[in-house]
Amino acid sequence: MNSSLPTTSFPKNVNEIISETYDIYNSINDDNKTYANCLIMVLKKYHLWPNIKVKKFKNRSDIVLLHNNYKMGELYEYRELYEQCRSIVLDFTLSFNNNVVVTYANSIPVRVDINTYITNIYNDKDKCYEAYDGTMISVYNHNGEWHFGTSSCPDANSSKFSHPTKTHGNMFDEILYKYYGKQLTDHELSLTPNEVSKILRSKFVASLNPEMAYEFIIVHYENIHIIDYTNILGENYKELVHVNTKNRNTFVDEDIYTTRLQDYVEVGINYPKEFTNITDAIGYINSNPYSYGLIIKKKQDNSVKLYKISTEIINYREETDPCHPNTWMNILSVYMKNKQEYTIKDYISNYVPNIVLPIDNNGRYIDPTYLIHTLISTIKDSLYNYYVSTTTYFPKYGRYKMNKD
């Protein structure tokens, strides 16, 4: 008997996913059907979810953000499709093959070490820029409305990580206020935060072309991931870096320096430092403790491939520190990776040596590894008991079925 599992035939590209989404939508006789839910059905059918995810736009079920989880590492079954879904906005009200509002599939860099890049990838026509530690804000116009999102969230106002309450949209507005605040009238300053936000953003997009999509990096003192720029930008720093402009019709990246916006330069919006050769660039990041690394732009036919290079110190930090503001979330993440060469004790020793540990009923400190392991084991036992009590095994079919009674 052949006991091998059947192989899954995955969609070859995004268009095949879109086509099947239309098919499912048209086959459902339900007034409450949505393209977003039909798209999720397609992803689940091929077991692509949650490696590829769907985010809905507020009050719109026909426009979605399709993005991957950026964590798959080596993936062979559907790598090309996975790469296409790095971050792409789809509008299902448009005609087939015309659904892509904007794609950032080639805007998320692939991390490589310095030696690999020099030996296997380098070309003297590559363009090299300084990388910045922050959150990318994507700005584009669709149906006469400007949108501000991140690579995994349609609305920057709903996106947050480093700060418990302040969103990336809030930080973006604070930065815009630094640049445009003096242009506001007393009446405008007296308006609600949401109204002031709209005014600031309208000033910000006044110089932008609706046919283009733009990418900016938020560099904010409350959005620190690896690099704290206080020593070079000052206390409570708030900066915006314009890193890319893309033609939405051809998906071709513009040269960021030949197309830089003078209006932005005049108000203080930054552009990335450009290097004339890779030797100077590597020397710069090795000698500058506040450098996050390099972004390499390599032209490939009609597209641009991005690579990110950092020092070994930065690479080690990103590999070993999840950088979540909640230390215990980081400890849980380290535990889940289950690496023998890097444990919870190593994480605590490196990054939180003064952690305050919980105390048991006898007044003794609870070992963090024991605490997390006990927590996970308890959850596993509970899930197993729930599963056993709510399902029945059918030997004829070799599967479990949920008891709905």
Kindly give the residue locations of the regions a language model identified.
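Core nucleotide-handling region used for phosphoryl-transfer chemistry
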Residues: 2-405
